[in-house]
From Swiss-Prot:
Residues 355-365 have a biased composition (Polar residues). Pathway: Phospholipid metabolism; phosphatidylethanolamine biosynthesis; phosphatidylethanolamine from ethanolamine: step 2/3. This is Probable ethanolamine-phosphate cytidylyltransferase. Transmembrane segments: none annotated. GO terms for molecular function: ethanolamine-phosphate cytidylyltransferase activity. It comes from Schizosaccharomyces pombe (strain 972 / ATCC 24843) (Fission yeast). It catalyses: phosphoethanolamine + CTP + H(+) = CDP-ethanolamine + diphosphate. The keyword Isomerase does not apply.
Length: 365
């Protein structure tokens, strides 16, 4: 963490941001802690394809994911793949931030060589154990869940990482509450500030699901809730790996971190059953020491032919979100499988680049 004397005003961080995961958000968080304003540049589909193979997510989807991260102040689409000092300066940024791994272009040259030569380069720690390449490998190779699963019981060993991700938009002060589901009473894993943000009626919205891959469908649902019901905090319930409706591509820890980085989420309940299978309203009130008056469950339009989601609030749990939860993940998985040969070739190219860059992609354990 930078001291106040070392804080920079405007910083630039760029990348593909494909399969937006906690490796991306951890780099963003570290960068935010170095400056006041963080601008994220997102590479175009064409430049990514040229330099490393086709992305899974479209430029629009990748920009949406970055915009949803609470530590991001601005997003610039179609940023050059090879870092350009003049491009960065156009947006008033003084330094570019990148992880401590080497990133090379199609010719094998360091993408940030010009920034380093100009002494306008800052470095943060690369996140080991997660990458777009790793996630694609899980899907293409049908890696068994037990290889990468994270049980609820080990989350306490990741408390420092979770607490960092539970910070507010400044990357420093507490924000998100995190609770662990136990049958008798909830366990507080991280204390946040949800109660301070309650509206005068002291209501909360609860949405539960697998939350796998954290797709455009998830983001659209959360944004709609926030826009239509301002002032009502959103609590996300997230199922344990073995309790998901279908095998998740991300493990529990990875899915929690995706929720924690999202600016729309105020609190998280880890490992509950589906809301309709337990006294969820009563239980959620227990999480907040009975200071919640009412728990609402959103009802989303289930007509996927309608371009815009429709939403209302109910006093009782329903299954409408599960359809969007599954649909978003399924669309991404189908996209990969339809272009399987392209992505397998991308994997081979990337692994070859890893050897050149001396980057080791580790399986999370």
């Amino acid at each position: 963490m930078a001291s106040s004397s070392n804080i920079k005003h405007r910083l630039w961080l760029d990348g593909c941001m494909d399969f937006f995961h906690y490796g991306h958000s951890n780099a963003i968080l570290q960068a935010k802690q170095l400056g006041e304003t963080l601008v994220i540049g997102i590479h175009s589909d064409e430049e990514i394809t040229l330099n490393k193979g086709p992305p899974v997510m479209t430029l629009e989807e990748r920009c949406l994911s970055a915009n949803t991260c609470k530590w991001v102040d601005e997003v610039v689409p179609s940023a050059p793949y090879v870092f350009d000092l003049e491009w960065m300066r156009r947006y008033g940024c003084q330094y570019v931030v990148h992880g401590d791994d080497i990133s090379t272009d199609a010719n094998g040259d360091d993408c940030y060589r010009f920034a380093k030569a100009a002494d306008q380069y800052l470095e943060v720690k690369r996140t080991e154990g997660v990458s777009t390449t790793e996630l694609l490998d899980r899907l293409l190779s049908s890696v068994p869940l037990e290889i990468y699963s994270t049980p609820v019981s080990v989350l306490s060993s990741q408390i420092d990482l979770l607490r960092r991700f539970a910070t507010d938009s400044d990357g420093l002060t507490p924000f998100t509450d995190v609770f662990i589901y136990n049958t008798e009473k909830p366990e507080t894993l991280i204390s946040g500030t949800t109660l301070l943000r309650l509206n005068p009626e002291k209501n909360i919205i609860y949405i539960d699901g697998d939350w796998d891959l954290f797709t455009e469908k998830h983001i659209s649902a959360l944004e709609l809730c926030t826009r239509m019901f301002p002032g009502i905090p959103i609590m996300a319930g997230i199922f344990a790996d073995e309790k998901c409706f279908e095998k998740p591509m991300l493990n529990l820890l990875e899915r929690i971190l995706n929720l924690l980085q999202c600016k729309y989420i105020s609190s998280i309940l880890v490992g509950p059953p589906p809301a309709s299978l337990f006294a969820s309203s009563k239980y959620i009130k227990l999480c907040f020491d009975e200071q919640i008056s009412k728990v609402y469950y959103p009802i989303f339009s289930t007509d996927v032919s309608i371009p815009a989601l429709d939403i209302s609030l109910s006093n009782t749990p329903n299954n409408s979100f599960y359809k969007f939860d599954k649909l978003g993940s399924d669309l991404i998985k189908q996209r990969v499988m339809l272009r399987r040969q392209h992505y397998e070739e991308r994997q081979r190219r990337k692994m070859g680049k890893n050897a050149t860059e001396q980057t080791t992609i580790k399986t999370y354990a």
